[in-house]
Amino acid sequence: MATGSNLTAVATALGEGERWWFVGTLAIIRVPGAAVDGRFDLTELLFPHHASPPLHTHPVDETFVVLEGHLTVVAAGHRFVLQPGGIGAFPAGVAHTFRVDSDTARALVLSTPSGLERLYREAGVPATAPTLPPPDTPRPSADEMRRIFDATGQVNLGPPLGADD
């Protein structure tokens, strides 16, 4: 990480930024790491009902701030519910997953240092609208996802949460 050579100020409105359809969700990169010298990136995510990633870890710290909807979260052996205004913080290497229990959920996700935005770009496709992706939106194959996870330091440890978990 450089020291102050690529710093700028960034201001975006809700829903404004670089948009990606990422594995059934909408990811809007609101503050790219390049704008803040890689210190962090900030992404707005829109999730559909019952969205749940596999239990996983990241090589960066991840903090969720729920704006809309309800999430059931399992992290470091604990289970909790996040509602609007709720925050979940997952240090690098801490296993976590979640499930969207509302019709949709929207959250701001902070990656410290920058890193998660690369995952959205590599596994996503450019979004043509600020909505959830259409059902026929291409998704990476299981082999492609493994390659992307390896390249970005993400580690899958277990299954996603089911509707009844």
Language-model segments: what does each one mean?
Residues 47, 57, 65, 84, ...:
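Conserved strand-loop elements at the edges of beta-sheets that form or border functional pockets
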Residues 29, 41-57:
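Conserved short histidine dyad/triad with adjacent acidic residue
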Residues 23, 74-76, 101:
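Short strand-coil-strand connectors
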Residues 1-39, 132-165:
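A short, N-terminal "cap"/entry segment at the start of jelly-roll beta-barrel domains
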